[in-house]
């Protein structure tokens, strides 16, 4: 009965707002399924991407059957998250399942057409079968997790260090065969992607900030976002006070030392050390550790209730939803100027609109501009357009994004 209530409530929460606008990364996922066949994804698209191909291949197969609406694109992530809840129930009971089912960050990413919900499911399945000592399945799911998201490697690494401390050397080998095989299979692609990543870090001014440097701010955000999700509000000091106090309360609940606490800490520690050399310390890249956090905590009704409140605040308030590209595109004409590589949402919602890179030569007297992502590339839109004789005449704001209109000054 308890499990049924948890599953139903968890599903209902995830279905609210599932048709909200896609944001940039989700639009990339959608356009990959439109423009590449399932076999072209690893052979063509993935060479210019920074993720392994398995999620995109799964999504391509899914959309061929279910279509590519916002709801359809996100439904696999919903399903993966529901499987995660059930597996955690098998491992820790209804209380732990409630923590995972209601966790606001897991709710948010279970509504996203990206690979994070999928990799969370694969890793918790691997951990479940590790407990059962069924190593074939451990290797299968750990291997698949690497082919879904490279950052998944930190959990098997943390588990391996834990086993090393336990002097279970043979078991370390037993759980890493599949992961090693996946790394070898994917190595040619990974090498190419690493080269491309280094080039991007050199060419794009602030790209390392997107990836997530190893610093106290990004580390602190992991502990806050793991407990309160993606919601944020002004004034910021009030937000950080409320979210910070809640985070302290939750994390105190898992101070007790058990194997899950140790595995969580070791896995996160490996990720932090790795991020010193290759930036990737963003909280959403570690959400697969939230089920481990829940197992470390055990069933805590008050915490589960708090998680549910934060999740409801998110799903019932559209101000906390993703960037509203859908509404923005409805206001566009036949052409828009922006950083061209960030144009996937425009192409998803209206492929007839021409996306022109704002850094090129502009000859029109009146232009529509989306400044989104310009700062990452070190582009100051006002300086760039002002230097060409343009002046901003109008600005329309949508959720987290804006549309600007610029005209030659002599026409104003």
Which residue ranges define each predicted feature?
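Short, solvent-exposed mixed-charge patches
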Residues: 411-412
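Membrane-proximal helix-loop-helix interfaces that form the catalytic/acceptor-binding platform
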Residues: 10-407
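N-terminal membrane topogenic signal
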Residues: 1-5
């Amino acid at each position: 009965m308890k499990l049924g209530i948890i599953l139903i409530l968890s599903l209902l929460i995830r279905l609210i707002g599932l048709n909200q606008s896609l944001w940039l990364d989700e639009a990339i996922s959608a356009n990959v399924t439109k423009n590449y066949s399932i076999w072209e994804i690893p052979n063509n698209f993935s060479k210019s991407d920074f993720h392994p191909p398995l999620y995109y291949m799964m999504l391509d197969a899914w959309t061929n059957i279910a279509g590519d609406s916002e709801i359809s694109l996100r439904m696999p992530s919903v399903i993966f998250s529901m499987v995660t809840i059930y597996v955690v129930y098998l491992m820790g009971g209804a209380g732990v399942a409630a923590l995972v089912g209601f966790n606001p960050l897991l709710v948010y990413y279970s509504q996203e057409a990206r690979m994070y919900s999928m990799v969370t499911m694969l890793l918790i399945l691997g951990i479940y079968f590790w407990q059962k000592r069924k190593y074939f399945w451990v290797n299968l799911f750990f291997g698949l997790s690497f082919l879904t998201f490279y950052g998944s490697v930190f959990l098997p690494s943390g588990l391996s260090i834990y086993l090393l401390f336990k002097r279970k050397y043979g078991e370390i080998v037993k759980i890493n065969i599949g992961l090693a095989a996946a790394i070898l299979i994917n190595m040619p692609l990974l090498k190419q992607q690493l080269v491309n990543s280094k080039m991007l870090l050199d060419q794009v001014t602030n790209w390392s900030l997107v990836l997530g440097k190893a610093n106290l701010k990004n580390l602190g955000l992991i502990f806050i976002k793991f407990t309160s999700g993606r919601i944020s509000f002004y004034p910021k000091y009030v937000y950080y006070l409320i979210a910070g106090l809640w985070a302290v309360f939750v994390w105190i609940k898992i101070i007790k030392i058990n194997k899950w606490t140790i595995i969580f800490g070791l896995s996160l520690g490996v990720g932090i050390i790795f991020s010193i050399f290759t930036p990737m310390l963003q909280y959403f890249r570690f959400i697969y550790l939230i089920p481990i956090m829940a197992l470390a905590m055990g069933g805590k009704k008050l915490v589960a209730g708090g998680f549910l409140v934060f999740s409801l605040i998110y799903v019932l308030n559209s101000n906390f939803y993703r960037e509203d590209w859908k509404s923005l595109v409805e206001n566009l004409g036949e052409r828009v100027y922006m950083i061209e590589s960030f144009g996937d949402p425009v192409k998803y919602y209206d492929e007839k609109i021409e996306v022109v890179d704002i850094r090129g030569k502009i000859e029109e007297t009146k232009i529509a501009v989306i400044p989104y992502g310009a700062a990452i590339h070190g582009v100051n839109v006002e300086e760039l357009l002002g230097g060409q004789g343009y002046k901003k005449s109008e600005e329309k704001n949508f959720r987290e994004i804006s549309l600007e209109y610029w005209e030659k000054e002599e026409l104003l």
